[in-house]
Structure formats: structure tokens, C-alpha cells
Amino acid sequence: MVLLLVIIYLAFISLGLPDSLLGSAWPSMYGDLGVSIGSAGIISMIISGGTILSSLLSDRLIRRFGTGLVTFISVAMTAIALMGFSLSGSFIMLCICAVPLGLGAGSVDAALNNFVALHYKAKHMSWLHCFWGIGASIGPIILSYSLIQWKSWNIGYRAISIIQIVLVIVLLISLPLWRKVSSVQSGSDESNQQILSFPELLRLPGAKQVLIAFFCYCAIENTVGLWGSTYLVTVRGVSAETAASWISLYYIGITLGRLLSGFLAIKLRHKQ
């Protein structure tokens, strides 16, 4: 289970890598693409729409194919999408590539969150999202280096895509390990747990409040992540490569907060 947890953490690093790229690269991208600054919102909404859709379908997919295979296919989709981003020279092509990027991100996010919630402790869940922050912090740094060395955002996307491809290979090799864990758990109580529909989930005590809080948090996080670099470049006069590296500090702060929450989870009960 320890080896599998390491693989899960690596998968969440890969999940965070592309999440911070669009906002960091956009000050350099929109001019090359010949579109307005606000067009980043269209790409972001397509990615978010795919993420929401695949998250809602994740329960059926996991029960049909298993967490390991869903994670493998999802990361493969994000790797292909990122390679598409790196080869794109038009806004329409970016919008097309945003579809598999969102679908892949939503599936792997839901699948791994569900798996860790079932098989590990609250501290592991906090640290899981801490590793997402590590990936999100590294993404802008790689992009900044790409802009400094080659004056190209495409190469930054390509580098992240290659990292994703390496993880796809790791996940492919680890598929027997996922099946082994699933076979051990097949006779446990979790296989007999009641499956709730979405309306039934909303009727659970506190569910609506949690959704509202999560919505507000995501709105703040994504707004800063998407537009932070553009603000620094257009309003503060910072260079695009410097702005990209500065945004990584924002994600490092999130990472440290989630690391701390993992230690707090050891001392506090779930309701606290």
C-alpha cells in the first residue's frame, strides 16, 4: 500500500503540472495567437466543463474499469492534450485540445480522491493535495525557464507533456498493483456500501454548505492562477518570464498550507 500511495502522489503531481500553465503562459500566448487577453477565459471554461463532466461520470467509470485503469487513461489523455497544446498555433486548436485536458483531469482527480478517502487517512488526503501543489508550483517554473531560454511557451508545454508521458508508463507498469489491492478489498465492507444518487448526496447534512465553500475556494484559486501573470505583465510591467516564476510562489503558498493541514489532521477530528 505504501508503494501505491507513492504512485498516487506522483499522479497528483502530474495533475497539478498543467493546472498552472495556461495562466502563466497566457501573457506570451495571446499575442502569438492573435486573440484578446480575455480569450483565456474561454479555454479555461472548456477545461472546467470537461473536468465537471468527467467528475460526474467518474463513479460509473471507476466501478466499470477500476481506479488504476481510469487513472492511466486519464493521465494519458492529459499527456496527449498537452502535446497538442505545444504543437498548436491557433486558438481553435487550443480549444479542441482543452477538451481531453479537462476530461482527463476530472477523472483522475475524482478517482484518486475516492481511492485515498476509502483506503487511507485524513492526513494522507491533505498531503495528496499538497502534492498537487508541488506540481502546480513546478509548472510555472518550467514555463519561465522555457521563456528565458527559448522565448517559447510551446516548449514549456512540451516539457510538461513529456513528464506526463513518463508517468503514463509508470501507471501502466503499476496496473497489476492496483488490481491486487482491488482484489484484496473486494470482500470488504466497502463493496457493500450503498450507492447514492447525486440528488441523494445533496440531501446529506452539510453537503450544500461544503459545495458552496468549495465553489468559493475554487473561484479564488483559479482567478489568481489564470489572471495573475497577465495582471503582473499588463498592469505592473513585469516581464512574462518573471511573472510566470512569481506565480509559482502563489502555488508554493498553497502547497505549504496543505502540508500543514495534513499535520493538523493528525491532531483534529474530521468535524473539527
Feature annotation, model-predicted:
Residues 3-29, 35, 224-229:
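Extracytoplasmic
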Residues 22-23, 205-248, 252-255:
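Extracytoplasmic gate region of multi-pass secondary transporters
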Residues 178-211:
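Juxtamembrane intracellular "pre-TM" segments in multi-pass secondary transporters
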Residues 26, 58, 135-148, 229, ...:
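Small-residue (Gly/Pro/Ala) motifs that create kinks and tight helix-helix packing interfaces
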Residues 155-176:
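Symmetry-related core transmembrane helices of the 12-TM Major Facilitator Superfamily/SLC fold
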Residues 97-131:
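Cytoplasmic helix-loop-helix junction between adjacent transmembrane helices
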Residues 53-92:
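Conserved MFS/SLC helix-loop-helix module at the cytosolic interface between two early adjacent transmembrane helices
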Residues 20, 47-56, 137, 251-259:
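Residue-level signature of mid-helix packing/kink "hotspots" within the transmembrane helices
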